[in-house]
């Protein structure tokens, strides 16, 4: 088992539903520690840079608009196999395909408004964490 860090974003739809605490509880029950957190309303430029990997995809504009539609809660999670564990907690990208009891099955409305983002690999996790947090903002 490897201790890892991963970036998690609770998206505007889930923030609006007031389920931040319920999602945090799931992280903690799964053995993930929240070692950094901030609430932020992303600017269009911030969202475009964060999701730049998708800039040529047809959904890019809609994704950016959704991510700037309201505040998001951004956190760094740490724990054994944190990346895989967080992705398991999140469930499938499309909430209709997500297993019962996952965050997306319970709180997401659509493939676009799908409640959460989580890093998909160690290199992207490190990059995404650096995008939102300086070393002095992470306590782990």
From Swiss-Prot:
The keyword Acetylation does not apply. GO terms for cellular component: cytoplasm. It comes from the Bacteria. Its cofactor is Mg(2+). Keywords: ATP-binding, Cytoplasm, Kinase, Magnesium, Metal-binding, Nucleotide metabolism, Nucleotide-binding, Phosphoprotein, Transferase. It catalyses: a 2'-deoxyribonucleoside 5'-diphosphate + ATP = a 2'-deoxyribonucleoside 5'-triphosphate + ADP; a ribonucleoside 5'-diphosphate + ATP = a ribonucleoside 5'-triphosphate + ADP. Gene3D superfamilies: Nucleoside diphosphate kinase-like domain (3.30.70.141). GO terms for molecular function: ATP binding; metal ion binding; nucleoside diphosphate kinase activity. It is found in: Cytoplasm. Homotetramer. Major role in the synthesis of nucleoside triphosphates other than ATP. The ATP gamma phosphate is transferred to the NDP beta phosphate via a ping-pong mechanism, using a phosphorylated active-site intermediate. PANTHER family: NUCLEOSIDE DIPHOSPHATE KINASE, NUCLEOSIDE DIPHOSPHATE KINASE DDB_G0292928-RELATED. This is Nucleoside diphosphate kinase. The gene is ndk.
């Amino acid at each position: 088992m490897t201790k890892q860090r991963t970036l998690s974003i609770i998206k505007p739809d889930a923030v609006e539903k007031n389920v931040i605490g319920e999602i945090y509880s799931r992280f903690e029950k799964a053995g993930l520690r929240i070692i950094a957190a901030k609430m932020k309303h992303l600017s269009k430029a911030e969202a475009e840079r964060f999701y730049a990997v998708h800039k040529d995809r047809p959904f890019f504009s809609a994704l950016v608009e959704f991510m700037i539609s309201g505040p998001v809660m951004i956190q760094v999670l740490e724990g054994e196999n944190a990346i895989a564990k967080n992705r398991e907690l999140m469930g499938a990208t499309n909430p209709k395909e997500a297993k019962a009891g996952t965050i997306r099955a319970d709180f997401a409305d659509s493939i676009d408004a799908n409640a959460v983002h989580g890093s998909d690999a160690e290199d992207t996790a490190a990059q995404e964490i650096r995008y939102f947090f300086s070393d002095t903002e992470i306590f782990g």
